[in-house]
């Protein structure tokens, strides 16, 4: 091979490498979602955007016969997504340019998943873990009450009620701490709307102060984001409702 041929050969290799790298690069308005689902029988994951009217399906992500999946997702602004596998789902909060990796098992998708490559989504994972543990505690209390001996029922019921109140106070604390420790993050919206045994932790009918606190921080970081505007309109609407109800009672 002469000198010119060698130069031409190396130029071709270089161009090929550049081409390969470009194909893997993310667009300016996208993020990468990949990972593995162990023991998967589902053909795909469903990615839905969390918005004002609930979940809006955004994309379907195929899962191959080895349980692996990978897809680049375009997004127009920071937002929240639901990632569903069968009947279970998790919430993620990706940012443009992130390469997110998720590993989970199919039979306990929401409880088993691990996530890397997305700081906001990792925060949600920790919040979800605490919420999952609270649900297990409530389930355990319910089972204990069902199996209680009729003779000892009253004392067992009193004991469970004390546990119930303590568990609620614990969830209120960790949820409030999460909001206080992550001001301006979209993840605080998930904390804001957390429920305990089906009842909102921060019920707007009692107080809108926590809603206003979350909004104040979001208006500093994401003033024009759809989620900020939705929360703002929600507060305005509920304040009017509360005001009208107060006037009616008078």
Tell where the protein language model's regions lie, with residue ranges.
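Bacterial N-terminal signal peptides that target proteins for export
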Residues: 1-8
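Helix-turn-helix repeat elements of alpha-solenoid scaffolds
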Residues: 165-172, 204-212
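N-proximal helix/coil linker or "cap" segments that precede and/or mark the start of modular domains
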Residues: 210-250
